[in-house]
């Protein structure tokens, strides 16, 4: 006899469950359970993951791979368990059935209710019920009452779970039993506190009185006993307490783990019928998630089917894209794609994306499709993508495959500032009952895990800050004992050691649901009958509980409505060109193959240029020397994990530079990689090598690509290798060539970049480069107005604009708008005037009032206050940004005048001054600020300066430095440089190497920090803002790197520039009707901390 567990809480009951759904399924299979019900609190968020895990186990079983196989990898704990000897091939294990359900927690019932839908209709009622409760509540909550349960739970098995005492449970139990006779049970879970048998006996008596039969439940919180301490930590997080105050809220033991039949039979030895009923209930719950049939909406005119409309629009697209007539190859591609789309039932999907793109363009919103969709001629003809078959080799199977049985995925980028208009149009077009965003699961990463677990464990803020400060970026690596010793912590300390272990366990746990960046699910019928819908944190947005992986598992189509800052930048640049140059451009009409643009890129002059502005890309540009659009496609794709890890970068560059010859494997394969000099760089080429070389069908080749990573982990890649090599040998290739081809595909199967995606991005890279080359003032203005986006902060964008001879003008209350704007100079060139948006904390609404009331200008701050009606706090921000300098009023004087105005706030007895009467402060002469203080104040208020660079002022006090612009020509091999850290990078493909970009008044330098040096100077590398680096120069053409040997943190020297003027002009006068209060004094800040605040870097990993 076996057992079905009908009550399992996973970690998708956030901060409660202590195991992943996948872990619960795997453990249930190991225990031999007949069935398992995933029943999270008012949620179905984790059930698809359990379903996917069960499918994977079934696939493994079909291939005779045991659950505890030779190389079983637990993706949740990221641990691999191996066996020294191969395990004998076993019979396929018996797997549990998955029952979909949830735990309904009502506002007016002392019982929790496990709801298990028996069929699809009942499932639809459950999702509608959950949607009702979630739409009533704020994000993350669900408000349901007993009346909702009585109205909406037809067709479900309902198991009542008493919470604490049984008093008061009988009336509710009887009421629900009368409403759903034969479907209501009393769930009895052991309490594991020594009173189990007495408790179960009391439950049996209540079941008899209520006519609701008793059923055994384990009420599992974890898959194994070793998660007990983590469960207690989650309780503390949920209750906002430390572990020392948990008291009776702690689990008394580890018994709330998932149990097998033997354990449950022992606990329910006096109630065997309760155990048998678990199997009866499991048998009655026949619903499976595979029954969810998704139907895409078909919004078409009467008398025209979706397929007919798609064919009509395609024909119109051929005329538009090929006014002189399309070549035969285009017609063949169209026929092939239309046939497959019709066969798979996807025409309405293409039409929906087309309609969304057409709406955006009708509103002047730039958009562009990308990703694998650029492999589709239909997407090109419908105007969804702009990559033509003349530019890349389209491999439609990379986009849609009959073999995969998965829906296509079209990603469309829109201007990030106007994407909300598109999102709201989708809601209006289809209704919120049919359209919703996907969820994104926010997980515990290292920093959050250290912070939250450290707080629960009672670690001081200093200790947790030190630990988290040693984590790079968003790493999942946890805390290293060696790092702890460096920080003066004892890793042998029992509490600290336990904290570190718990941090490692919680990393990867879901923390809460958020909204996907733009993945929309749109249905023909009710979306809330597919998945529960809840409110998002953002106003006017709703989302389903499942993320993109969940809907992929279930074969549900989504439309990705994504935001891209560069599209916003390009559109704003086109607007500025139309306004100032009377030139009308679009992405399609930008002059192509411009030599000056490519010259600029070859010189690594690419700050702000889309996709090629990182230091790695800028270092690669002079080696690549792009001269055509396809060169840019390769440039975008080659500095990626796939080609780097596959060892393909150096062979390509050597061949491009003529240092080695391509080694063709035969005319057929040579044609596949001809444009990449015999080196496969793209996923599409991997597919074509399998088809052309090994005789695979297109579907088989795509299956190979997708399977390589998982088969490599499972240790069974040999079978695929043998099949591939045998296919190539049959086609006449040698064993050596076959093995090399397979090695190339295997080398970057995990990370290979699609050629179609690279081409879509390369188009934007070229357009942005052309704008920067020929219209630097316009490009810089648009780039600043599109922030936040990109690789560099506004300070670097401003500096780069000056390097391109663009005049920068400061913020001025009589000249600036909210946006940065262009002003015509006397010589006809364009100057860039900084806008109010550059002031930290300034609101667009306040800027609008200032501009609207400006007229012929403001003579002084008081006039601005009276005419624009802004608050004194706004005036202070303007004064701190030196926005009154055009009036001849310096920072200190302006701040003095503004605080005098603040002192004129209405008196309680006399709200209005007498006619024309204004209280005037006596004239005060304040000391002028020196240049260093001005620079500090610029960074405080705007994070940039148009004055001197900090290094220009500090250089006389730091001798022995080589300016950055001299590194390419200096004769010395060993040099020292110093500069502000503007970026830190630690790519996953760089084997622990750190790349720093330092900036001084002459330019930037690229610093390479090898792992050994990084370990020696780790805290300085990660935390310093002004670094002096001594090392050796490495030159390759115009690219110069400094290989670090010694690193010093000079951040405290930035304090020599001056201190923020917190008390430079005295105190604010309190209002008369307020009790006098001393001005709060800011906490004294260490110079290193001040440097971090004033001169932040952008760190990438």
Curated annotation (Swiss-Prot):
Q: What is this protein called?
A: Error-prone DNA polymerase
Q: What does the UniProt keyword field contain?
A: Cytoplasm, DNA damage, DNA repair, DNA replication, DNA-directed DNA polymerase, Nucleotidyltransferase, Transferase
Q: Which reaction does it catalyse?
A: DNA(n) + a 2'-deoxyribonucleoside 5'-triphosphate = DNA(n+1) + diphosphate
Indicate, by first and last residue, each region the UniProt record lists as having compositional bias (Polar residues). 1065-1074
Asked if Nucleus is a keyword of the record, the answer is: no
Please give the residue ranges the record annotates as the region Disordered.
1055-1101
Q: Name one GO molecular function term.
A: nucleic acid binding
Q: What class of enzyme is it?
A: transferase
This chain's source organism reads Ruegeria pomeroyi (strain ATCC 700808 / DSM 15171 / DSS-3) (Silicibacter pomeroyi)
Give any single GO term for biological process. Answer: DNA repair
The EC number(s) given in the record are 2.7.7.7
Question: In which residue ranges is the amino acid composition biased (Basic and acidic residues)?
Answer: 1086-1101
Main localization category: cytoplasm
Please tell me whether the keyword Nucleotidyltransferase is annotated for this protein.
Answer: yes
Q: Which InterPro entries match?
A: DNA_pol3_alpha_NTPase_dom, DNA_pol3_finger, DnaE2, DnaE2/DnaE/PolC, DNAPol_HHH, NA-bd_OB_tRNA, PHP_dom, Pol/His_phosphatase_N
